[in-house]
UniProtKB/Swiss-Prot annotation:
Origin organism lineage: Bacteria, Pseudomonadati, Campylobacterota, Epsilonproteobacteria, Campylobacterales
Recorded superkingdom: Bacteria
Taxonomic source organism: Campylobacter lari (strain RM2100 / D67 / ATCC BAA-1060)
InterPro entries for the chain: DUF520, UPF0234-like_C, UPF0234_N, YajQ-like_sf
GO molecular function annotation: nucleotide binding
Protein name according to UniProt: Nucleotide-binding protein Cla_1551
């Protein structure tokens, strides 16, 4: 049995799940009666984790956004980690959304502070886009996971490599 256990807190999302959610949204877009005859598309820029919603009506653009968010939730991606970049209008309305897939330094410091304030017998350290938490008991690590989830940060947090 290991004398120390650890896990990583990461902001990474599963890119395949994001693709699957957007594909499901496209299928629903094709089958929805209220969106028939309206030009609407969903485009994904994988390198920048940005997706673009394009629709010929601003009201339908909001419907399209709701469809995408519902599909993301069903796929286990936290919608709080999605930031609206900008809205463009012209012949078509466009909405650019960015999926945060990293923990920024401010959020990492908040998480680290919450872990230290919990007075559990664990140590945490910020390692780039991840936070490593080390402790002797798995119960303490599970308590840390619960504390971090209760922080309600606008991130897609995932807990990896529990050893």
């Amino acid at each position: 049995m290991a004398s120390e256990h650890s896990f990583d807190i990461s902001g990474e999302i599963d890119k395949q799940e994001l693709k699957n959610a957007l594909e499901q949204a496209k299928k629903e877009l094709d089958s929805r009666y209220d969106l028939k005859g309206i030009k609407s598309e969903i485009e994904l820029n994988e390198k920048e984790s940005v997706y673009k919603l394009i629709c010929s009506s601003e009201a339908k653009l909001e419907v399209l956004k709701d469809i995408v968010i519902s599909k993301l939730i069903k796929r286990g991606i936290n919608p709080a980690g999605i930031k609206e970049l900008n809205r463009e209008s012209g012949a078509n309305f466009r909405l650019n959304l960015k999926v945060n897939d990293a923990i920024d330094t401010d959020s990492a410091k908040k998480i680290n502070k919450a872990i230290k304030d919990s007075k559990l017998k664990v140590t945490s350290s910020i390692r780039g886009n991840e936070i490593r938490v080390v402790g002797k008991q798995i119960d303490d690590l599970q308590s840390v996971m619960k504390i971090v989830k209760e922080l309600n940060l606008e991130l897609n947090l995932s807990f990896k490599n529990l050893k």
